[in-house]
Design a protein with these regions (language model features):
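Outer membrane beta-barrel
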Residues: 52-219, 224-231, 235-244, 313-316, ...
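Outer-membrane beta-barrel "beta-signal"
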Residues: 350, 364, 378-392
Length: 392
């Protein structure tokens, strides 16, 4: 069956059902006129316009919150044949401002300021969007923000619980996409609708949906073709803090550096992906996903055009402020067992007060592709890293 036809049919059916549910939710929801609470990565500093004589400010009711965080890292590996065995790294330096205007509109602007300057490197905008949040069951977001694909992708680096995202989130949910797209941190330019439906007795919503149209070229890049990426997700929450659902992505990426004289280059590659997963986030954390991808690599015409990945993460509190995470993390670049790379990881996260996080990570890697590589190197190796996060 044609994939585009199937996606359109499913989306039409889903939207009819969601609109019916939304009408019921609107009658049950008493919070429609209140600004939606927004979970921030850091506490930051908030300013509000109060006791002003300006009629415009009284109408706008603007608030603004400033914050940010720094993540510094030291890593060491015993893998042979590498240019370096590790070292110090400034993983993230991010600054943001967010807030509300006219009560119902939430905005966010976030900069990443670490890294050497260059094309798609160094200081750059990662988030710049506004969202209309008048109703829980229907919200509209416009600008540059996270693609709605996968449970882990929307997570801040501060919440993942491990020293990096899973390979599924990195390679297929587009934190660092396998297809050759510049580093976009899982984000793109576009518009998205989303909402939460059917409130339960304890206040949690049973159904969440999200659907967006995007350029498909990643952050800070204009559209380069006549195709828009369609990305969506739908999940249910039978109990508070538990979500079970799936995601779909029908898109295309255009090679902005295409060279017709280079036989390794592809002008564009399709990005047809789907995933299923679950998450439970409370004192305990349980999170797992499977993702599958169809589409090649624009810088390597010979690269496989099918890949998949899966992971399982568990986190348990040990003592106050200390949480231990374990992760089983797999990626198959060619969707074959001979292309499997598996990371077995364990991490300790200790929070010292509200603004400091100390993290110790260990990873054992088993990379089957290294056993068949032209340049031989260790296929099994160990990596340790220490990360310190300061929030402000």
């Amino acid at each position: 069956m044609n994939f585009d036809f199937l996606m359109q049919h499913l989306l039409k059916t889903s939207m009819v059902a969601l609109l019916a549910l939304a009408s019921q939710t609107a009658m049950a929801d008493n919070e429609g006129n209140a600004p939606r609470e927004t979970e921030r990565e850091t506490q930051g500093i908030t300013f509000e316009s109060k006791n002003t004589d300006s009629k415009l400010l009284q109408t706008m009711k603007p608030t603004i919150n400033f914050g940010g965080y720094i993540i510094a890292k030291y890593s060491i590996s015993d893998r042979s044949g590498q240019a370096t065995n590790g070292g110090f790294d400034l993983r993230f330096v991010r600054l943001y401002a967010d807030g509300h205007v006219f009560n119902d509109f939430y905005y966010k602007f976030q900069l990443e300021v670490n890294g050497a300057p260059g094309v798609d490197k160094g200081p750059r905008v990662v988030d710049a969007f506004m969202e209309w949040q008048k109703f829980d069951f229907f919200r509209v977001k416009l600008g540059q923000f996270k693609r709605p694909f996968g449970f882990e992708n929307p997570y801040s680096p501060l919440k993942v619980g491990y020293g990096c995202y899973s390979q599924a989130t990195m390679k297929i949910a587009s934190i660092g996409d396998r297809n050759g797209e510049h580093k976009s941190s899982g984000r793109d330019l576009g518009v998205q609708i989303q909402g939460d439906l059917l409130p339960g007795a304890d206040g949690h919503k049973w159904i969440h949906y999200q659907l967006g149209f995007f350029n498909g070229q990643g952050i800070n890049h204009a559209d380069k073709d006549h195709h828009k990426d369609l990305i969506g997700g739908l999940w249910i929450s039978p109990i508070k803090d538990l979500a079970i659902g799936g995601f779909g992505w029908n898109g295309k990426y255009t090679n902005e550096k295409y060279d017709a004289s280079n036989p390794n280059h592809l002008k564009s590659v399709k990005r047809v992906r789907w995933g299923v997963g679950m998450k439970y986030e409370s004192d305990w954390t349980v999170r797992g996903e499977y993702m599958s991808s169809v589409g090649g690599v624009v810088t390597n015409a010979a690269a496989p055009d099918r890949s998949d990945a899966w992971y399982a993460t568990i986190g348990l509190p040990v003592i106050k402020n200390l949480k231990i995470y374990g992760r089983y993390d797999c990626y198959r670049d060619a969707k074959t067992w001979s292309s499997l790379r598996t990371d077995y990881g364990i991490s300790g996260n200790y929070h010292l007060g509200k603004n400091l996080i100390f993290q110790l990570n260990y990873t054992f890697t088993d990379d089957r592709t290294a056993r068949r590589a032209a340049t031989r190197t260790d296929s099994r190796y160990n990596t340790f890293d220490v990360q310190v996060t300061a929030k402000f």
